[in-house]
């Protein structure tokens, strides 16, 4: 009898425990948000899996391609859900244009962060900061001083020296008849330029600093997809006392903190005559300004550099790699680029940044590569308030996901959207400034758009333009086989090549005495 009572009690306890857990899961994860379909005319929603909704689509290897198939079947504006978290998916240039034109302020926040205290996209991050006083202050500081025209002019020699160093390295490979992995060479170039522009120094190869930085950037990019899921589910998980992927995120953050703290200490020990010309000096001046519009902290400074290295390094590297891949698969484009550069620059000196405004075809080639291969194929935002888009109601706090990859291949606004045609970006192929403005806002989104568009896009164009221009001007290139394999892969949330681009440089103008 005692055994029976004990058995019944155990069963009862297990039943109650399961019931409570089920109730909690339902309440926190599966309960519909306040703005339900019964009360509002939401966009159409494709069939979803029980409980988890459409989460499986975000877990695919090529998320942008999975979402492209979904939108081609069900429409350009869709309502998705991850458990009970609402998401609006946009896959049309016209819908994207309407949102950026009418809801720019409303979508100027990216939502909550994955882990507040992390330097990697935490609460101190300029990239993930909500649209408020801190973000406005940092945007103004970035546009006016950190990446403004004067700052770019002051740092021009830094970029020119590293482009020359890049060229010398390729020249050495050409003499040895060795192939190079374009992505790795571009990564070295970007790391050197960004370190010198931001901190006035390059990280040392000897003591492993360079490798540490590259490793942290790679690790952070690898975490980005996890961070996106952590952000989506954070509000629900917080109620249960759970922080998704916190250990991984804080592990990378702490390593960045050690590296950047060392940089800050060493910079303070520099003589005053060596200070005042790089981004770190501008940020330290703002940090010490008691009358500043917003009082930033050391964590804000560190987080800015984390944003810079994660946001600018791999995106520019992939742009260089994809652009060279397209050039190699289209030899007539290489010939036209070379003719333009030889005509403007000549054959007695190396291409310079000041030449770039006079090289429209080079610029068009880079833009076309960005159109077909945007580094960040998905652009996340958050609707702060409820609004109407395309005749449908969008509830407040709904995540917005713009599939820039699909928007920039929209056949309704792009002629032959799957073909590599740089000519579409030449001024002669467009009519008037209004068309150009609409093109930028409506169709071309590799750097986002509106208030949250990338403030470093002009700098990226200068570095990528100088690098691509130099490689075209100075070298012929050989590949294994007839064509470059253009198969895509995604690293974190960055669109990259599944097979790294390997080319063999051949000196075009020996002995390149002007290098």
Curated annotation (Swiss-Prot):
Localization of this protein: Membrane
UniProt keyword Oxidoreductase present: yes
Pfam families found in the cross-reference section: p450
GO terms, biological process: gravitropism; positive gravitropism
Binding residues annotated for heme, in chain numbering: 454
CC terms in the record's Gene Ontology section: endomembrane system; membrane
SUPFAM superfamilies for this protein: Cytochrome P450
Enzyme class, UniProt record, top EC level: oxidoreductase
Topology of the protein relative to the lipid bilayer: Single-pass membrane protein
Disruption phenotype: No visible phenotype under normal growth conditions, but mutant plants exhibit loss of tropic response to gravity when reoriented relative to the gravity vector in the cold.
UniProt cross-references to InterPro entries, sorted A to Z: Cyt_P450, Cyt_P450_CS, Cyt_P450_E_grp-I, Cyt_P450_sf, Plant_metabolite_P450s
CDD domains with a match to the protein in the record: CYP93
Cofactor(s) listed in the protein's UniProt record: heme
Molecular functions (GO terms): heme binding; iron ion binding; monooxygenase activity; oxidoreductase activity, acting on paired donors, with incorporation or reduction of molecular oxygen
Family: Belongs to the cytochrome P450 family.
Job of this protein: Plays a role in the gravitropic response of the inflorescence stems and roots. May affect the synthesis of flavonols that have a role in regulating auxin transport.
Name of the molecule in the record: Cytochrome P450 705A22
Organism whose genome encodes this protein: Arabidopsis thaliana
